[in-house]
């Protein structure tokens, strides 16, 4: 059964990139200074990621197994235009996806065909259309929302996301771009409810997978000590 999934590497305080990540320019050029590299470094050091990028070596450990599992489960991808444009040159003629990629954008462009099974189709009629087109060609495998963070929030807000995995890196950035920002636009006393389904801990990163249950009202639950608002369905 096809699931729509998303994964993001984040700091303990919830940032997936630092403040310099905003603004114009190629995000790949500014990634290291923006703190992006600090929360994704764990992935670049493992063999599964390096093999997809055409590099040798790398650690063969739990983190590598998580990366390999993610690639193998994906039958199609959805990503934002900024990520696609920023990756076009460094990914080269054989990008790591090896599957159709649907790029959410306001600017039309012809489909790009690359070696290894990767194609980039530019979708101008919204995130729901991109997800539906990806689902249609995923062959029963997952539709992976590759990012960036703004696109993940759009998919979550639209109720299209089935599974979210956060890779929590033991670092505090203090400022930058948050995974869950105000543009989720939740109503007053409303929450998006998640159920943890897997936790894998390593010294470099903790992988927490959630099933996305959808929106639910926040009500006052005074059972037990302390009470406080909780999400109920």
Language model region names:
Residues 1-233:
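Enzymes that bind and transform nitrogen-containing heteroaromatic metabolites
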């Amino acid at each position: 059964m096809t699931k729509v999934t998303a994964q993001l590497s984040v700091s303990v305080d919830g940032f997936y990139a630092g403040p310099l990540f905003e603004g114009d320019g190629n995000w790949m050029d500014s990634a290291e200074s923006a703190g992006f590299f600090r929360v994704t470094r764990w992935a670049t050091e493992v063999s599964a990621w390096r093999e997809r990028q055409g590099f040798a070596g790398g650690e063969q450990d739990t983190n590598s197994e998580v990366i390999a599992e993610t690639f193998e489960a994906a039958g199609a991808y959805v990503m934002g235009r900024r990520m696609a444009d920023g990756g076009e040159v460094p990914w080269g003629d054989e990008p790591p996806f090896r599957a159709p990629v649907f790029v959410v954008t306001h600017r039309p462009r012809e489909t790009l065909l690359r070696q290894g099974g990767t194609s980039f189709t530019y979708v101008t009629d919204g995130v729901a259309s991109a997800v539906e087109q990806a689902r249609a060609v995923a062959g029963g495998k997952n539709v992976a929302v590759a990012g960036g963070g703004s696109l993940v929030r759009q998919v979550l807000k639209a109720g299209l996301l089935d599974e979210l995995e956060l890779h929590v890196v033991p670092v505090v950035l203090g400022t930058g771009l948050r995974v869950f920002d105000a543009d989720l636009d939740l109503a007053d006393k409303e929450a998006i409810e998640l159920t943890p389904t897997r936790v894998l801990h390593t010294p470099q990163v903790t992988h927490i997978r959630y099933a996305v249950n959808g929106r639910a009202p926040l009500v006052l639950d005074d059972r037990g000590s302390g009470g406080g608002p909780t999400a109920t369905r």
